[in-house]
Amino acid sequence: FLKAALASGLALEAFPARSASQKSSEQLITIIDLDKCDGCSDLSIPACVRACRAKNQARYPEPQKPVQPYWPQPKYEDFSNDRDNISRLTPYNWIYLQHVSVDGKDIYLPRRCMQCFDAPCRKLCPFGAIDQTKQGAVKIDDRVCFGGAKCRDVCPWNIPQRQAGVGIYLKVEPKLAGGGVMYKCDFCA
């Protein structure tokens, strides 16, 4: 089962489904040879994670403190005190390596947004905050996102992650509206 799941996931990422009328010579894809990825076992931070963090560090959110809870629930998602966590996706870590072992072989799977060709998150966002470039990058506009997390709910991989204490809702109605902003890999678009 695990082998089939791994193969399916890679096939989905490398060869997104599209109709003949949707073909674009500008569409970008990522092909990763998992046989060559060793998880950068000799480094404290894998090279792909380090490169992503260096490229996007200026875009990471700086929440207003104290972070307000999501009304009417007394909770919120604040990763700002855990920015160095590279073991999962957060608003400060847009890619991580998942380690699995199949038949005694170690496999490292880069986990990040797959930039779905027909992205369900883009269709479902009630605020129209998600767009897709000609190159296929699925981008969340942090100036428009209210952090409703519908994109994460519909994402088959739960990729977008919310950071409270940032976003347009702070200007509109900080105690009643929204929950922050959703963040994810956008192909460095």
Segments (PLM) and residue ranges:
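Non-ligating segments of multi-cofactor redox enzymes
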Residues: 1-189
